[in-house]
Each structure stands twice: as C-alpha cells, then as structure tokens.
C-alpha cells in the first residue's frame, strides 16, 4: 500500500548513494549477497533477545536491498539479478518471524506461525501473477522500477519492515503485531488472487 508512494521519494536518494558505489569491483549481485548475509544475522540476534542489534541488521539489509536495485538500474537490470534479489528477499522475510519465535516460543510460536502462513499467501499470489504478467507482457506502471511485475496490496514491503521494526522495539507485543498483520496479509492475498484472476480472465476474452 505504501510502496508506490514511498519508492519515488526514496529513489533519488538511492541514486545519489550509488554514484559512490558505482565502482568496477562492486556489482548489484554482490550488494544483494552482502545485504542478505547481514540480514541473516537477525535470526541469531532475535533468538538471543538482542532486539536492537537485530533492528540494526534488518535496517542495513533493507538499505542494501535498495542500493542493489539502484545500482542495477544505473547499469542494466538483469533477469538473473532480479531472481537473486527476490529469492533472498523472501528468505529474509521468513527468517525474521522465525527469530521472534525462537526468542520466546511459548509466547510467539502460534502467532509467528500464523504470520509465516500468511506470508505464504502473499508471496505465492505475488509470484504467480508476476510470472503470468510477464508471459502476457502486462504493463506495470505503478512499479516501473521493478525487474518483474509487482502486484501491490494492503501489506507490501514497507508495511512488513514497519512490522519488524515495531517487533524489535516492542518485543513483548510481537504476538499481537503478528496476529493483526497476518490478518491484513490474508486480505492482501484475497484481493491479489481475485484481481489477478479477473485480469488474466479478461485477457482470454480478447
């Protein structure tokens, strides 16, 4: 919901940063891998209850995720880079809730499981439509900076990061955050499946 409004404002700042990073030894895929390696640290940090340390690596991961895309656009977007980026993004989004579960299994296990279950819904509907949109060459005007078709919704990347930030700042409330956000994710999944189905169905009639 917030991505399409936030990205145009952040993109100029990222472009300024990648001017410094645009060196022969630095590649978009390299930034993706470094960002993921940093993001993976959130899992042990959360499991140990080091919430502020986890917050730092989560934010660094998201910063590098923005920089790798900006550097790729400065040079050339590639299918391989887009595939690597989205694959590692989804793994990162899954490991953070798992870290909260490990931190307090009695309190967070059920809510964290609900959140991961909801992430499967948003992720599968997102990727399934992206694949078919590319096949039918459907335009993606709202997210032209993406290397694949980006089907929006109520809970997108920005909202997910806000959830993780709130969880790190108020870990005792993570279970409540997870229950509420998971419900919003299922609303997103329903709207994506329905709108995606109608869009693809209309193409068959043309």
From Swiss-Prot:
Q: How does it sit in the membrane?
A: Multi-pass membrane protein
- Which top-level group of life is the source organism from? Bacteria
Recite the UniProt keywords alphabetically: Cell inner membrane, Cell membrane, Membrane, Transferase, Transmembrane, Transmembrane helix
- Residue numbers on the Cytoplasmic membrane side: 61-79, 135-146, 197-206
What GO terms fall under cellular component here?
plasma membrane
Q: Which InterPro entries match?
A: CDP-OH_P_trans, CDP-OH_PTrfase_TM_dom, CDP_ALCOHOL_P_TRANSF_CS
Q: Does the keyword Cell cycle apply?
A: no
Please state where this protein is localized: Cell inner membrane
Kindly report every residue range on the membrane side named Periplasmic: 1-37, 103-111, 170-173
- Principal localization reads membrane
One GO term in the molecular function aspect is: phosphotransferase activity, for other substituted phosphate groups
**Which sequence ranges are marked TM in the entry?**
38-60, 80-102, 112-134, 147-169, 174-196
Q: Enumerate the Gene3D superfamilies for this protein.
A: 1.20.120.1760
GO biological process terms, alphabetically, are: phospholipid biosynthetic process
Q: Which family does it belong to?
A: Belongs to the CDP-alcohol phosphatidyltransferase class-I family.
Provide the protein name.
Inner membrane protein YnjF
**Species the sequence originates in:** Escherichia coli (strain K12)
Q: Which gene encodes it?
A: ynjF
